């Protein structure tokens, strides 16, 4: 519902469940309870992910992982920026950041964090993009708190960037 010029208030559960439902209706496949073990690399950069079931990891079982090839990978894992952490740990300080490393999320400052989120949505390593709170964690911006608008715009922006690159 409208709150002020350019601002809306929404029930968070209804809004996010509707987004998930509509995305699934459009063809999205959600792989629930999966963990990233590694990334796949080729000369041109990141080329996919190495995944396993979270329960396998938790139980310490020896189960071969699944590999998923991709021309572009998005780290939208939130504050933990899990995929970028794997790249930093395994490839080294080669990220598209001031010192090649994850800069670390700053303490909450909602309006500054929301503005930075859009700017920080970008390619952090060849074929690896960051969106949402992962982008602020990678580029050292403040966390945002309970604000969804920037997250949605970040998701749209990263999609547009990838579509343009893959043309």
What role is predicted for each listed range?
Residues 1-167:
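Residues forming the flavin
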């Amino acid at each position: 519902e409208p709150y002020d010029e350019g601002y809306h208030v929404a029930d968070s559960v209804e809004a996010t469940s509707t987004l998930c439902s509509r995305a699934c209706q459009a063809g999205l496949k959600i792989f629930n309870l999966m963990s990233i073990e590694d990334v796949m690399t080729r000369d041109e950069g990141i080329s996919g992910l190495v995944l396993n079931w979270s329960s396998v990891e938790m139980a310490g079982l020896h189960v071969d992982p699944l590999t998923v090839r991709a021309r572009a990978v998005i780290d939208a894992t939130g504050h933990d920026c899990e995929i970028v952490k794997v790249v930093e740990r395994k490839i080294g300080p080669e990220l598209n950041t001031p010192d090649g490393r994850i800069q670390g999320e700053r303490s909450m400052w909602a309006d500054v964090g929301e503005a930075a989120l859009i700017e920080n949505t970008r390619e952090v390593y060849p074929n690896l993009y960051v969106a949402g709170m992962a982008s602020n964690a990678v580029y050292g911006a403040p966390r945002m708190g309970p604000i969804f608008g920037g997250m949605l715009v970040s998701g749209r922006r990263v999609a547009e960037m990838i579509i343009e690159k893959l043309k």
